[in-house]
Amino acid sequence: RDRMDTIVTGHYARVVYDEASGRYLLKKGLDNSKDQSYVLYNLTQEQLAHTQFPVGELSKHEVREIAEANGFINADKPDSQDICFVPDGDYAGFIERYTGKTSRTGAFLNTAGEPIGTHRGVIHYTIGQRKGLGISAPHPLYVCGICPEQNTVTLGGSQDLFSRRLTATDVNLISCDSLEKPVRVQAKIRYRHPEQPATAWCTPDGVLHVEFDEPQRAITCGQAVVLYDGETVVGGGRISSAEKS
């Protein structure tokens, strides 16, 4: 590590040095359909200064053409749709193997906190999930809350999935030093989710607050919220709470 000046990765993103602010900026890749800036929001100024994303200036088609021209055996490899280290899509199984712990059954609760059934283990569920619950009800039920500490999963109607505000911790800002005053941004709450207009600010305790113009469906604790100003990543954090609307 001490002998390297730069690390080069294949992420679809760009790094630009802004002379006016004296900061390195993280920008979206030019191929918006492949942009990966969302997963890079926690890079520091020091890391950005020594990182290059050459494919960020290219489309996926152009990358394939270059790979084919240079005889790469994977030039025509289909795009991956899953996490690269979980190729079979069995996320719960991966967590069990990685942690060495098996998931425990627990209580399904309704929105009043009353038990209505038994779940297979919290790692098998995600906010907004409808299929595979094994619960019969006169109306569709969705996962609207997960509490690992209590080993409970809360089920509710579609109206219970919407939140207008969230907070986030482990905040990293890239384009600025602070967000003491509210600023207008485009906020993204998951990798494939369209950015949404919002207002964002940080409180003195370092917590990021985001208020959306319109309620958002299935804001999920533990996921990243990433803020954009056009093509530039302002920063982001790990979602710690969502206020139901």
PLM features: residue spans?
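Nucleotide-activated chemistry modules centered on ATP-dependent adenylation/adenylyltransferase
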Residues: 1-233, 237-245
